[in-house]
Amino acid sequence: MERTWESLFIEEAKLLGHSEEYIQLCLDYASILKKNNLPVIFDVEHLLDYYWTGHFPWANACCRFDWAYKDYKIRKKTRGFREISAPIPTLKWCQHWIQHNILEHVVDRLSSSVHGFVQNRSIQTNALPHVNSEWIINIDLKDYFDSISQKKVLDFFLQLGYEDSVSEFLSNVCTRFSRVTYQRALPQGAPTSPLLANFLTINLDKDLERLAEELDMRYTRYADDITFSGVQKTCPVTPRDIENIIYEHGFRPNKSKTRIRYKGSRMMVTGLTVGNGVHVPKEYRKQVLRELHFAKKYGPENHCRKVRNEKGYFREWLLGRIMFVRSIDKEAGTRMLEIFNDINWMM
């Protein structure tokens, strides 16, 4: 007969001389975690010795120093750059473990209005509820990840049922010093940050959902992009009303990106048009077709030389754009892919 982990734990604990009271406390603690389908972690030593074997020498140190991250910038689709903090491999492994073994086990806590970084949801599912609206409000959360402090992350792990030292250690692994808020916060680039950000925006989502329900509006959020829409001819809420709720939850709106659009103007949600269906913007599709045309007519190398681009990078960049179009509009994307495959990339 196979023995349960409880019986093995009790036997080992008694051999180590622990009291009945201590053993029962441990079993009660473990039952809360197992009920939520979470790994049982009694203390930091247990985590490092049992779950993170082989990463023990580095796990505690690398989450405390700046050299544990490589900082770089990527160009945004609009103006400016996005700063990325990529963890070194050891720290990244630990963060992936937290992501897969803890965070993904409680993803059902997220509302159906949340579409970013959730399996089977996307910018397309985020845009779909807003199709054929009379008006749309777009609001962007400023410095989203930097706004989520280690204290909030610590409280989240405590709420899951983990004891103090384990929660503090996990929150250290998932945060770093922010040059925006001058405190430890979620780094943009850590595997754990997207889901943690979602969990720590749940209360904001609840209040915004309540507002939407009261005023017969639609609400969705994709990461830091908040969208409201409705079928009423007149919008029943102002951006300021929404921004006030955002401030109450410790976030800040990026006012330069706040937009309210009415039917007849171009209505967009997370980069997609939603006038009479979800579509890739016409300008985007035209640019892809233009690049395909010149690459096929003059050859990729000549075209890249003219636009001062590297051929290898250009090929991947163009294919990425085609696959994006295909993910939203399969027919249009497939036609683009056929042209792409007809180009002589050896030229």
Provide a role label for each language-model segment:
Residues 78-79, 222:
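Short glycine-enriched loop/turn motifs at secondary-structure junctions
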Residues 164-167, 219:
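Alpha-helix N-cap/helix-initiation sites
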Residues 138-142, 189, 193, 215-230:
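Catalytic palm active-site di-aspartate
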